[in-house]
């Protein structure tokens, strides 16, 4: 099969990219052909044969005028939609595998995939791997960053709670944009065009199923890892955390739970 991997970053920038690159390596080893679409960056290590990428959006280092321009582009990215069409026409994929697309590529590319599929009478499947909770929580963490408490107020499509709580970086403006983005694409029912949503845990699947747009299309599939030969060593029992030191990762909760474990 021909598989088009879609992600905003096409270079090692975090766990999502590690997943994409490892999965792609495995797919290629099984005889499949893989190409990629995302933002242009000088550090990109994968790509597509037609050389089509969308402009890089850097919220943190952007000038004021660019931030104004980005405020529209993060909801509907016309350039991304135009550029992915070039890749679709050239590569002719059998499967488009979406990953982190929101706020940079935006779900506008799904509309172009559907249009291309219909115009060319293609049976191309669309798969969406969820690396966070963005489709059901505009700040993507299901956690209020101001109180550091878990939060599920937006579940079921109640995205106005993001604005009420200023849940995106404590900013009313950013939270408003996130709320608008969520309502816009849910009301357009663009996600009905996705065949399967892959959730990295049963918990995530349960939360995704709280929205009728996703219910019936979700599957729980744990992230994979390479197996290694176990070494027999003498050691005490311990708990290992492997990941980024960040508040939303739940390290405080892990520490508190460990305190309750028997010695």
Locate each region found by the language model.
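Short donor-sugar binding/catalytic loops of nucleotide-sugar-dependent glycosyltransferases
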Residues: 9-11, 224, 242-246
């Amino acid at each position: 099969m021909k598989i088009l991997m879609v992600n905003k970053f096409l270079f090692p920038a975090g766990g999502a990219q590690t997943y994409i690159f490892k999965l792609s390596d495995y797919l290629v080893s099984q005889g499949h052909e893989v190409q990629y679409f995302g933002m242009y960056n000088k550090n990109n290590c994968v790509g597509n044969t037609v050389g089509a990428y969308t402009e890089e959006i850097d919220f943190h280092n952007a000038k004021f005028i660019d931030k104004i321009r980005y405020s529209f582009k993060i909801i509907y990215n016309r350039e991304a939609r135009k550029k992915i069409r070039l890749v679709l026409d050239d590569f002719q994929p059998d499967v488009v595998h979406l990953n982190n697309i929101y706020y940079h590529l935006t779900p506008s590319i799904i509309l172009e995939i559907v249009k291309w599929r219909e115009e060319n009478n293609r049976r191309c499947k669309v798969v969406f791997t969820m690396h966070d909770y963005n489709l059901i929580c505009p700040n993507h963490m299901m956690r209020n960053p101001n109180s550091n408490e878990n939060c599920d107020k937006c579940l079921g499509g109640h995205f106005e709670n993001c604005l009420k709580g200023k849940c995106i970086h404590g900013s009313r403006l950013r939270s408003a944009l996130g709320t608008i983005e969520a309502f816009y694409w849910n009301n357009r029912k663009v996600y009905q065009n996705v065949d399967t949503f892959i959730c990295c845990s049963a918990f995530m699947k349960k939360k995704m199923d709280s929205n009728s747009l996703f219910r019936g299309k979700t599957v729980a599939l744990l992230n994979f890892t390479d197996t290694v030969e176990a070494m027999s060593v003498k050691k005490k029992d311990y708990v290992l955390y492997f990941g980024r030191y960040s508040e939303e990762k739940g390290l405080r909760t892990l520490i508190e739970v460990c305190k309750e474990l028997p010695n």
